[in-house]
């Protein structure tokens, strides 16, 4: 909230124009995406704690989820860095990474559905893993969105 308040103060007092205004508005939008990333991370942590703490699933069964999470985690800092540096080349790279993450998510979803059909006892835990994977995929989408704000800041009107 403090950053959003600071953005509003800058707009009210300084009345930025053109590129400066686009940057302040982008920062304001980034805050929303970072908050949503935090919400998704919280969901993942709660599900992982529940799954592992209650021995509903072995840690090795979360390997692909961990791998997807590592890719997503590797997207957040570069997305923020791209915005700070106004690096449009990084936006393209992050967009490609997100496409791969989306494909990986779909492949993992198919694999988990097959696993549930083969072992109906695993349905509850597997559905939780699916929700975790979806949260990870959403985090990747938010990271890509943060990077895409670079395009809106750098484009001329």
Residue ranges and their predicted role:
Residues 1-157:
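Cytosolic, long alpha-helical scaffolding segments
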């Amino acid at each position: 909230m403090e950053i959003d308040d600071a953005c509003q103060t800058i707009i009210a007092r300084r009345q930025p124009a053109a590129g400066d205004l686009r940057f302040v508005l982008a920062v304001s939008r980034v805050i929303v995406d970072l908050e949503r990333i935090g919400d998704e991370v919280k969901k993942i942590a709660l599900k992982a704690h529940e799954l592992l703490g209650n021995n509903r699933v072995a840690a090795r069964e979360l390997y692909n989820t961990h791998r997807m999470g590592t890719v997503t985690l590797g997207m957040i800092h570069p997305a923020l860095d791209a915005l700070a540096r106004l690096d449009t080349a990084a936006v393209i790279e992050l967009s490609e990474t997100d496409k791969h993450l989306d494909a990986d998510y779909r492949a993992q979803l198919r694999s988990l559905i097959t696993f549930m059909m083969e072992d109906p006892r695993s349905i509850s835990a597997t559905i939780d893993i699916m929700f975790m994977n979806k949260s990870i995929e959403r985090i990747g989408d938010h990271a890509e969105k943060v990077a895409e704000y670079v395009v809106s800041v750098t484009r001329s009107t």
